[in-house]
């Protein structure tokens, strides 16, 4: 492996807007990285995800195909 062509691999403190912090390693030159969303507060990971049904498309689909037999 060639020397001096690879980026430095530094310790980085990740800070989320929810207050969660953890330490990882990265090639960025900063000591801290501020995030808006992490796995502790993201709706997909917390189970609080909402499914948006715009204009009743699910109901329209169900009513259209309700008469078909399986």
Swiss-Prot record:
Xref: PROSITE patterns: RIBOSOMAL_L31
Residues at which Zn(2+) binds: 16, 18, 38, 41
A GO biological-process term: translation
Note accompanying the cofactor annotation: Binds 1 zinc ion per subunit.
Segments crossing the lipid bilayer: none
A GO term, aspect molecular function: structural constituent of ribosome
Entry's Gene Ontology cellular component terms: ribonucleoprotein complex; ribosome
Coiled coil: none
UniProtKB keywords: Metal-binding, Ribonucleoprotein, Ribosomal protein, RNA-binding, rRNA-binding, Zinc
Swiss-Prot/TrEMBL cofactor(s): Zn(2+)
Pfam families linked: Ribosomal_L31
Main function: Binds the 23S rRNA.
Family of this protein: Belongs to the bacterial ribosomal protein bL31 family. Type A subfamily.
Self-association and partners: Part of the 50S ribosomal subunit.
Name this protein carries in UniProt: Large ribosomal subunit protein bL31
Taxonomic path: Bacteria, Pseudomonadati, Pseudomonadota, Gammaproteobacteria, Candidatus Pseudothioglobaceae
């Amino acid at each position: 492996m060639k020397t001096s062509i690879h980026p430095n691999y530094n310790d980085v403190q990740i800070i989320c807007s929810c207050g969660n912090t953890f330490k990882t390693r990265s090639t960025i030159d900063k000591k801290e990285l501020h995030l808006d969303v992490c796995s502790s507060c993201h709706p997909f990971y917390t189970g609080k995800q909402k499914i948006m049904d715009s204009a009743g498309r699910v109901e329209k689909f169900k009513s259209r195909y309700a008469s078909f037999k399986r």
